[in-house]
């Protein structure tokens, strides 16, 4: 039995990046031997075990064969006879197909180290084209390592084009696709993810609504530079679309509720946000009510953040941000307690609250214009 570190842990150590998770590969062992040593099986599709002391995952070396469509269309074979090289050759990129033994020696049968030095994302073998999820994974790696100068190798981009043309991308589940999209959006240069998908003709199949949308990429770039959370980045990416298209993308990838809600609100309300300084008090009140700003003030603040990222993406300042925040504060300063104490309830209470909030917004607008 031989145990190796593999994949990202080896890659990131050689790049001088922090290593968070370690993938362990076991060569020359059977399932029975792993059980005998106290390892606990957890893999549903292929033999993966948890270390009895550390809880880390250890996978038996395996081969794979294409047996159906999509990410899950593979048959796996694990046995003590599977060699290290046979396991590594099934991996996606050469930089992910290196192993490290217990002496710290790097085993590199597919020249991943050279590709690290040349800053290339290159596929290991033609079998790369059998897994459509790899199109998204490579685009995500391109986004992650763009700050280090990495690019997708020309021949790998050609294979990605072949996958896109094959129709296999349609076999990807919403959950698997979103997992890659989510991780890519949280990289330092997420716009590279979209650009690579466009370069290999995958974007027009997965997210055709975004094809050629430079404003979306500019806003997303700003969101990343300002370290915004996922739901703000997603809303920035979709901000230039009509609500129907936003809804379609949300549903296509089953985006989390927070992402869906903010993206839809931006699509429906951004034009009023941009016109904030010209809005009549009645329209401002309607905008604040749309966001339920009295009970969910953070959602309105997130909306303002998206609008700011959009403006910065086009090289503009956004004085509307302070105006919107102050208007919200003026409306929220109106309290229901005095009205309740005066005996108002139900519809009468609601109408009185609305009237006082409207008066507060009128006073704020008049003061801001003087």
UniProtKB/Swiss-Prot annotation:
Names of required cofactors = Mg(2+)
Give the gene name: cca
Its catalytic activity?
a tRNA precursor + 2 CTP + ATP = a tRNA with a 3' CCA end + 3 diphosphate; a tRNA with a 3' CCA end + 2 CTP + ATP = a tRNA with a 3' CCACCA end + 3 diphosphate
Native species: Pseudomonas putida (strain W619)
- Residues given in the record as CTP binding sites: 8, 11, 91, 137, 140
What is the similarity comment for this entry? Belongs to the tRNA nucleotidyltransferase/poly(A) polymerase family. Bacterial CCA-adding enzyme type 2 subfamily.
Biological function? Catalyzes the addition and repair of the essential 3'-terminal CCA sequence in tRNAs without using a nucleic acid template. Adds these three nucleotides in the order of C, C, and A to the tRNA nucleotide-73, using CTP and ATP as substrates and producing inorganic pyrophosphate. tRNA 3'-terminal CCA addition is required both for tRNA processing and repair. Also involved in tRNA surveillance by mediating tandem CCA addition to generate a CCACCA at the 3' terminus of unstable tRNAs. While stable tRNAs receive only 3'-terminal CCA, unstable tRNAs are marked with CCACCA and rapidly degraded.
Where does this protein hold ATP?
Answer: 8, 11, 91, 137, 140
Binding-site list for Mg(2+): 21, 23
Q: What is the lineage of its organism?
A: Bacteria, Pseudomonadati, Pseudomonadota, Gammaproteobacteria, Pseudomonadales
> What GO molecular function terms would the record report?
ATP binding; CCA tRNA nucleotidyltransferase activity; magnesium ion binding; tRNA binding
Q: Which UniProt keywords apply?
A: ATP-binding, Magnesium, Metal-binding, Nucleotide-binding, Nucleotidyltransferase, RNA repair, RNA-binding, Transferase, tRNA processing
Concerning CDD domains, the annotation shows: NT_ClassII-CCAase
Enzyme class comes to transferase
Q: What is its EC number?
A: 2.7.7.72
One GO BP? RNA repair
Extra remark: A single active site specifically recognizes both ATP and CTP and is responsible for their addition.
Kindly indicate whether the keyword Metal-binding belongs to this entry. Answer: yes
Please state what the protein is called.
Answer: CCA-adding enzyme
Entry superkingdom:
Bacteria
